[in-house]
Design a protein with these regions (language model features):
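Conserved short beta-strand elements that form part of the metal-binding/catalytic scaffold
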Residues: 27-58, 64, 99-105
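Vicinal oxygen chelate
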Residues: 16, 60-99, 104-107
Length: 107
């Protein structure tokens, strides 16, 4: 079986332009016609109401390179990382309420 990778996320947003700008400024991403592009990933924000939360644990995850880097992000968001057996992480929500996890694998 061939390898796969995530290519894009399609996120409903009441204010797609504003949400794209939030992701761009928060995570230092570039914006191209309301499409936020990061390394190998496209996030499309489409006009529309959120579809609701089918499961409370629905979120997107951003991997950071180290615990020090994670602590820097946590400080930016006034978060407190949780240390687990497999990874250290913390969660925030974007302005539309979508869950975001920032994490790094445990050493």
């Amino acid at each position: 079986m061939s390898e796969i990778r995530l290519d894009h996320l399609n996120i409903p947003a009441r204010d797609p332009v504003g949400l794209a700008q939030w992701y761009a400024s928060t995570f230092s991403l570039s914006v191209d016609r309301h499409v936020v592009r990061g390394p190998g990933l496209i996030i499309v924000f489409k006009q529309g109401d959120p579809i609701g939360r089918a499961v409370d644990d629905v979120h997107m995850g951003f991997r950071v390179p180290s615990v020090d880097a994670l602590n820097g992000w946590a400080k930016k968001f006034d978060g407190k990382p949780i240390v687990g057996p497999e990874f250290t992480s913390f969660r925030i929500a974007d302005p539309e309420g979508n869950g975001i996890e920032l994490y790094t694998p445990s050493a």
